[in-house]
Curated annotation (Swiss-Prot):
The chain crosses the membrane at residues 1-21, 33-53, 61-81, 94-114. This is Fluoride-specific ion channel FluC 2. The keyword Iron does not apply. Keywords: Cell membrane, Ion channel, Ion transport, Membrane, Metal-binding, Sodium, Transmembrane, Transmembrane helix, Transport.
Length: 117
């Protein structure tokens, strides 16, 4: 039962952090590319890799921080919806392809780097 509560608490914190980062990025950047999603997904991948590489998977730490906070922070569903939005009438195939590839490649590199440091 404690594990479920830790995941819930962490997930709430991660979701609020994502909302704050999204709001800040929308105010700071006037970009056609959704920068906030890139920031949260790549940073989350780096931290998850670090935790995997350093065996920081204590009984309470992993459910709270990785599953909860980082699960609430990172977002595959928002990435998917942003990609669908890029398929609008002003569709730019190169923007769609580059954004898609960069999300997955940089996320993997960040996770790998986090694991190795």
């Amino acid at each position: 039962m404690i594990t479920i509560l830790l995941v819930m608490l962490g997930g709430g914190i991660g979701a609020v952090l994502r909302a704050l980062i999204t709001n800040i990025c929308q105010r700071l950047f006037n970009s056609k590319i959704p920068i906030a999603t890139s920031i949260v997904n790549i940073t989350g991948s780096l931290i998850i890799g670090f935790m995997m590489g350093h065996a920081l998977d204590s009984h309470h730490m992993f459910p709270f921080f990785v599953t909860g906070v980082l699960g609430g922070l990172t977002t595959f569903s928002t990435l998917s919806s942003e990609l669908v939005n890029m398929l609008s009438p002003q569709f730019k195939p190169i923007r769609f392809v580059v954004y898609s590839l960069l999300q997955f490649i940089l996320g993997f590199i960040a996770c790998f780097y986090g694991y190795r440091i």
